[in-house]
Swiss-Prot record:
One of its GO terms (cellular component) is Rab-protein geranylgeranyltransferase complex. GO terms for biological process: intracellular protein transport; pollen development; pollen germination; pollen maturation; pollen tube growth; positive regulation of protein geranylgeranylation; small GTPase-mediated signal transduction. Substrate-binding subunit of the Rab geranylgeranyltransferase (GGTase) complex. Binds unprenylated Rab proteins and presents the substrate peptide to the catalytic component composed of the alpha subunit RGTA and the beta subunit RGTB. Preferentially binds the GDP-bound form of Rab and stimulates geranylgeranylation of various Rab GTPases in vitro. It is found in: Cytoplasm. InterPro entries: FAD/NAD-bd_sf, GDP_dissociation_inhibitor, Mrs6, Rab_escort. This is Rab escort protein 1. Keywords: Cytoplasm, GTPase activation. Residues 538-563 are annotated as: Disordered. Belongs to the Rab GDI family. Its main location: cytoplasm. Residues 550-563 have a biased composition (Acidic residues). It comes from Arabidopsis thaliana.
């Protein structure tokens, strides 16, 4: 239970929009609505910004996961009652559903970690990076939120397998020629494929495309994996393209278990995002960047932009009930944990907020219709994502600090149905102390056991557990390639439910963090909802001045995000 400090009454008590939760989608929406001139109240029950996209210290991450994991069902809600000060409304109690399950947290070097625990900024929804050309960057530039966040490059990307070998992802002409793991034939095949993709992309932007080679419409509608086979690419190259560049999750060669068989046109779009991200910013080493101090900086950047435009922020303030019109059933406002009643035209809610089923039985059809987006819906195929966070001493790859590792389906064990992604981040990003790294792991799964098994397999492939009888800080274990594996100091494993956003007329619910590596779908959900709320009004129509749209980045390799 969150202790609510005494708050003075909010003034005003009427707004155009109330937003609950400071995740990425909610924060983008609050910033956009504030920029359009709407009055916005932005609340969060937590004492920090970011909600499920927050970056936290180790103690705070531990506390959040335990307090928000699956717990016994709450006692039945009391029936809706009219607020004491206005009998034209009824109040409907809200409850929080748990997004997390199978939470397991282990510490192997407690004294060292306790000494440095507040020097960690650990992502709750990792691994996640930003493509230099993705929509989140475009929105940051358009809104001016880029003034409040700094980035650094991801140094390298690798593909892993059960042998423990990490192979570089050949994602550019220079990388292909430098790659010693590819034969001359494979290099030529990969270069030919990339040239075809670039020619196709060029033909779609040029008026006179008679001299460019274009992929046929028939091929564009075929499965991407079949198109790669048609191009006579060997399995190793196909795997790199599918899972380490296009960033697919499911085994594209197994139609029985693949839930999303990608078409070639979608695959080309994914490759286009990767290709256009390479070199977009002069001091970015590759396609991927990451915010200094953690991904929690992204929602905070949009919150700061919203505050400049007049949005009012209150943390540590849950809402406890919705206020509905007794006659029409329409939404009118919310009751805060402080007891104050606040009114608005529209309401946007965190994915955890829902109504107890017991509360619905005594409501009218109109009232139930208003609340329909908040009623938990059973899903036939309930997809989840298993996440892991590790603090390690050492690096998974010598002389590399910030790196992405992808394990394609079946690369670690035969039953591995989905790709496993691992992101290593170092102290240069201000996420951990020097000489340590933070690893984030994730994989889609149908159930908790399946997901945790996959994560543990990737962990054992990359890192070594300390020997219980000899937990000396400098102890290391050698792998089969005579290289030393990093030592695990701390670990968190958990499974997160994937909740889709529900868009209603006056009440909408935002999605939970998804299973993607980037923010495109998360940002897209905010853009779609904004269009429904504001109609044809342009998102962030006010342009920032050139001086305001530039970061003052003069330090250790930071990436300047500017037009």
């Amino acid at each position: 239970m969150i202790d609510i400090p005494p708050y003075p009454p909010l003034d005003p008590s009427n707004y155009d929009l109330i937003v609950v939760g400071t995740g990425v989608s909610e924060s983008v929406l609050a910033a956009a609505a504030s920029s359009s001139g709407s009055s916005v109240l932005h609340l969060d029950p937590n004492p920090f910004y970011g909600s499920h996209f927050a970056s936290l210290s180790l103690p705070d991450l531990t506390s959040f996961l335990h307090s928000n994991s699956v717990s016994p069902p709450p006692s039945p809600s009391s029936p809706p009652l009219p607020p004491s000060n206005n009998h034209d409304f009824i109040s409907v109690d809200l409850v929080n559903r748990s997004l997390y399950s199978s939470v397991e947290i282990s510490s192997f070097e407690s004294e060292i970690l306790e000494e440095h625990s507040r020097r960690f900024n650990v992502d709750l929804a990792g691994p996640r990076v930003v493509f230099c050309a993705d929509e989140s960057i475009n929105l940051m530039l358009k809104s001016g939120a880029n003034n409040y966040v700094e980035f650094k490059s991801i140094d390298a990307s690798f593909v892993g397998d059960s042998s423990g070998e990490l192979r570089n992802v050949p994602d550019s002409r220079a990388a292909i020629f430098k790659d010693k793991s590819l034969t001359l034939l494979e290099k030529n095949q990969l270069m030919k494929f990339f040239k075809l993709v670039q020619s196709h992309l060029a033909s779609s932007t040029e008026k006179d495309d008679s001299t460019t080679v274009k992929i046929s419409e028939e091929d564009m509608e075929s499965p991407f994996v079949d198109f790669l086979s048609k191009m006579r690419l060997p399995p190793k190259i196909k795997s790199i393209i599918l899972y380490a560049i296009a960033m697919l999750d499911y085994d594209q060669d197994n139609t029985e278990t693949c839930r999303h068989l990608l078409k070639t046109k979608e695959g080309i779009d994914r490759l286009a995002l990767y290709i256009t991200s390479m070199g977009r910013f002069s001091n970015a080493l590759g396609a991927l960047i990451y915010p200094i101090y953690g991904q929690g900086e992204l929602p905070q950047a949009f919150c700061r932009r919203a505050a400049v435009k007049g949005c009012i922020y209150v943390l540590r303030m849950p809402i406890t009930a919705l206020l509905l019109d007794k006659e029409t059933g329409g939404y009118k406002g919310v009751r805060l944990a402080s007891g104050q009643e606040i009114f608005s035209q529209k309401l946007i809610l965190d994915p955890c907020v829902t109504v107890g089923l017991e509360s619905l039985s005594s409501l009218t059809d109109q009232q139930n219709e208003t609340l329909s987006v908040l009623v938990p819906k059973s899903m036939i195929n309930k997809e989840k994502i298993a996440r892991g966070v590790c603090v390690i001493r050492g690096s998974v790859k010598a002389n590399v600090s910030n790196a992405l590792v992808v394990y394609p389906p079946k690369s670690l064990f035969p039953e591995q149905l989905t790709a496993i992604r691992v992101l290593q981040l170092g102290s240069g990003l201000a996420v951990c102390p020097a000489d340590m790294h933070v690893l984030y792991l994730s994989t889609l799964c149908d159930n908790d056991d399946q997901g945790i098994k996959a994560l543990l397999s990737a962990m054992s492939n990359l890192i070594s557990l300390p020997v219980p009888e000899n937990r000396q800080s400098d102890s290391v274990v050698e792998n089969d390639t005579s290289e030393t594996k990093p030592i695990l100091l701390w670990r968190a494993l958990y499974v997160q439910e994937l909740v889709k956003g529900e868009f209603g007329g006056t009440i909408s619910s935002m999605p939970s963090p998804d299973g993607n590596l980037n923010y495109n779908e998360i940002v897209e959900s905010a853009v779609k909802l904004y269009e429904k709320l504001m109609g044809s009004e342009e998102l962030f129509k006010e342009e920032t001045s050139p001086a305001e749209n530039t970061t003052e980045e003069e330090n250790d390799g930071g990436v300047e995000i500017e037009d």
